[in-house]
């Protein structure tokens, strides 16, 4: 018995030693990674206010930027927050499907599927932008334009889900005619405004750049959240008992907090150079936007299950199909806008280098 116990302890000790060596083994298994550099060693385009170090050097092979997912630099938290959020969305939706709650053959399910697609799209586009933008100036513009297309798609995917599953009758009777066309236009305008601001203004960025980004995105949010905000307000005034309404409330609160950190460079403004790797405002923005999306997903899944009869009373298959088709039209228009401005950026960079 004593011998068996000692053998087991020896095995556990060896396992502990192997676990402690795991980070070193992983590091040795990866290609040799260039060290990060200070802001003075990267072009002006890549520098962020109050972030003094942790930049990845430009001009390396694509492999380096993909493997930088496992390197300590000033974008890695931005990448991982949205990577983990995308995995969480997929796992939560998979659990929902496994529970038998999804009606695959029903038009009732299409807006939910598009919302899941839009959520994964914006999270993936965002993490790719932060992971790969450092390769070159053209890559920087290209991947951020892709990011803006993802945001536009997510805005309209949210609008579809809120319209079909979450709106109450009083709001629906007032706004049903023009809500989706207006949401599609605001989604495209948000993408166009962000792409134009990125193309037009150079560092150090003027206030007008932030206005071009924030105002269209703010309009899109106010419109897209209006069915939810109306329902949540009425619910809380009546002593809210709906679980979905509480998740919608969290969604709104998390988004407002994330919007603040997107708009204001805090806390790095007050601690320059101390938040280079962890703790700067854009990372906090990513974290709150991720939990906003997860709260929104929970609310929409509850509405999908609990408000099925309301959906059937309001919407026929044709209206659902046409609304869902508009999702792909918006995605195409946003992608075309981003592509056009990318060509303009490419021409400008060619002229600069010639």
UniProtKB/Swiss-Prot annotation:
Chief location bin: membrane
GO cellular component: Golgi apparatus; plasma membrane
Tissues in which the UniProt entry reports expression: Expressed in brain and testis.
Keyword vocabulary terms for this entry: Cell membrane, Developmental protein, Differentiation, Lipid-binding, Membrane, Oogenesis, Receptor, Steroid-binding, Transmembrane, Transmembrane helix
Subcellular location(s) per record: Cell membrane
Its membrane topology: Multi-pass membrane protein
Membrane-spanning parts: 77-97, 112-132, 174-194, 214-234, 244-264, 284-304, 316-336
Residues on Cytoplasmic side: 1-76, 133-173, 235-243, 305-315
Keyword Transmembrane helix applies: yes
Any Pfam family: HlyIII
Residue ranges, Extracellular side: 98-111, 195-213, 265-283, 337-354
A GO term for molecular function: steroid binding
An annotated GO BP: oogenesis
Function: Plasma membrane progesterone (P4) receptor coupled to G proteins. Seems to act through a G(i) mediated pathway. May be involved in oocyte maturation. Also binds dehydroepiandrosterone (DHEA), pregnanolone, pregnenolone and allopregnanolone.
Family the entry assigns: Belongs to the ADIPOR family.
Note: Non-classical progesterone receptors involved in extranuclear signaling are classified in 2 groups: the class II progestin and adipoQ receptor (PAQR) family (also called mPRs) (PAQR5, PAQR6, PAQR7, PAQR8 and PAQR9) and the b5-like heme/steroid-binding protein family (also called MAPRs) (PGRMC1, PGRMC2, NENF and CYB5D2).
The name this protein goes by in its record: Membrane progestin receptor beta
Organism: Mus musculus
Gene of this entry: Paqr8
């Amino acid at each position: 018995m004593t011998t068996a116990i000692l053998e087991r302890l020896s095995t556990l000790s060896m396992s502990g030693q192997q676990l402690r060596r795991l980070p070193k083994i992983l590091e040795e298994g990866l290609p040799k990674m260039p060290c990060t550099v200070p802001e003075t060693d990267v072009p002006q385009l890549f520098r962020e206010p109050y972030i003094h170090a942790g930049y990845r050097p430009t001009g390396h092979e694509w492999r380096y930027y993909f493997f930088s997912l496992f390197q300590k630099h000033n974008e890695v938290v931005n990448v991982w927050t949205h990577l983990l959020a995308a995995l969480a969305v997929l796992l939560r939706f998979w659990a929902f499907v496994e529970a038998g709650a999804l009606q695959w053959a029903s038009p009732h399910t299409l807006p939910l599927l598009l919302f899941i697609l839009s959520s994964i799209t914006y999270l993936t586009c965002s993490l790719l932008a932060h992971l790969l933008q450092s390769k070159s100036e053209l890559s920087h513009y290209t991947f951020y334009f892709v990011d803006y297309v993802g945001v536009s798609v997510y805005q309209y995917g949210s609008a579809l889900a809120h319209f079909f599953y979450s709106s109450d009758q009083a709001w629906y009777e007032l706004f049903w005619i023009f809500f989706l066309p207006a949401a599609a236009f605001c989604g495209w305008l948000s993408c166009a405004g962000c792409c134009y601001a990125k193309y037009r203004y150079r560092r150090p960025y003027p206030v007008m750049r932030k206005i071009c980004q924030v105002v269209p995105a703010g309009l899109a949010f106010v419109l897209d959240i209006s069915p939810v905000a109306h329902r949540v307000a009425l619910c809380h005034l009546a002593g809210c008992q709906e679980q979905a309404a509480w998740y919608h409330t969290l969604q709104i609160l998390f988004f407002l907090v994330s919007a603040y950190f997107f708009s204001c460079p805090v806390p790095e403004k007050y601690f320059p150079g101390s938040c280079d790797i962890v703790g700067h405002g854009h990372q906090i923005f990513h974290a709150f936007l991720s939990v906003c999306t997860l709260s929104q997903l929970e609310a929409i899944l509850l509405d999908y299950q609990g408000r099925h009869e309301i959906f059937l009373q309001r919407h026929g298959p044709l209206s659902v199909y046409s609304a869902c088709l508009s999702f792909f039209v918006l995605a195409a228009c946003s992608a075309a806008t981003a592509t056009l401005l990318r060509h303009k950026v490419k021409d400008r960079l060619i002229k600069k280098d010639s």
